[in-house]
């Protein structure tokens, strides 16, 4: 379990030292992710609003009337007649059938909810990609600063040795100047690296929610596919980009049915009870009661082209959404391909850079020994030292790029999510919020009217949605530090 969230400026008992801690904290407290979850609740309400089409409405009204009506009577008889009336009533309306319009609206709203959940998954993947990026950026820059500091120490020793040789006439003033110049350059590079580390720490704080400490090495990402074909297969099923496009098309398809249903007849019951009488002087016994009940059947014949226009617009939107599925599919293929290629090249760079570091270290150590006995010049030593440092820096960058690329592959597949990456974290389940409002203001006869109205519209097949179970082999490999459970 990860620690409770606090404001960035608030003191904390412990810092997120591992990648699992960082992911858990960002998953729980990142404002962008929290805002997206709140937005999803707005979409949930669209389903409730759609169902309201087959639920009763109750309205009340109260009127008061005062009127003076002129008379034709001669004076001194009254020249006007005063009338004051009051009335109050309650009207109850219940739609029994509206040609499948409400059933289609419910199907469209359900698909919109599911599409919004896929949008939330996309946001989560984006945030976690930023967390991984920020984490390994800090780790990279910490290692670079360490290499630069070590480089400064080595060059300081080299300058001392060169000066000692100069004192006894073994080297010239030029050798001393070369060592001094290299040391000055190393100081400047260290300052630059420290500045970059501060920038990376600020980025980490922004996305995770707290300042980084000395971060632990990142673990191997879980669930990495063995081949690019496996990555494509997973993305075809689990990519939120593709899933959202499909859900959006389902919604617009249901809206076509809803638009067509506007031309069908509707049946409603309406009942009214009211009282009316003289306001002044008020006498309850003078008020008469009126009770009416009626069945209303409505069949549109002509709407000025409104319904036809709505149908054409809905059809055009559904066509666009069906085309967008292919666009989303191509986007996913591109993302997986690019991420896989980047990962493959980065891993290859790690292998070659490791060999380069090994060879450069042997060369540097040999050059140092040969310099001590006069077989190498100061410049030879400085060049060998610079070659070794460049190789070490290249290896650090290669490790960084490979890990970011691996996270990119998981993101393109649709598996860069907390449920796949970490254990012991209370996962956000969007279905929980939806279930709370799904049957809000429900009535015992809702199911009967739903089935009756559905007879007027073709069914749009949709999945149940919700959080999918972890696939086999997708057990999270990381666990954040223990802490109090999420509220």
Show the residue positions of the predicted features.
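Acidic, low-complexity, intrinsically disordered peripheral segments
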Residues: 12, 68, 396-487
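A glycine-/polar-enriched beta->alpha junction
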Residues: 24-34, 41-56, 90-107, 118-125, ...
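Boundary at the C-terminal end of the N-terminal hydrophobic targeting segment
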Residues: 7-9, 14-16
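Transmembrane beta-strands of outer-membrane beta-barrel pores
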Residues: 64-70, 96, 273-277, 299-301, ...
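Residues that define the transmembrane beta-barrel architecture of outer-membrane proteins
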Residues: 84-86, 287-291
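Membrane-embedded beta-strand positions of outer-membrane beta-barrel proteins
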Residues: 36, 58-62, 245, 267-271
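Periplasmic alpha-helical coiled-coil/stalk elements that build and connect Gram-negative outer-membrane
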Residues: 126-236, 248, 342, 346, ...
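Outer-membrane beta-barrel translocator domains and adjoining extracellular loop/strand segments
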Residues: 70-77, 104, 217-219, 264, ...
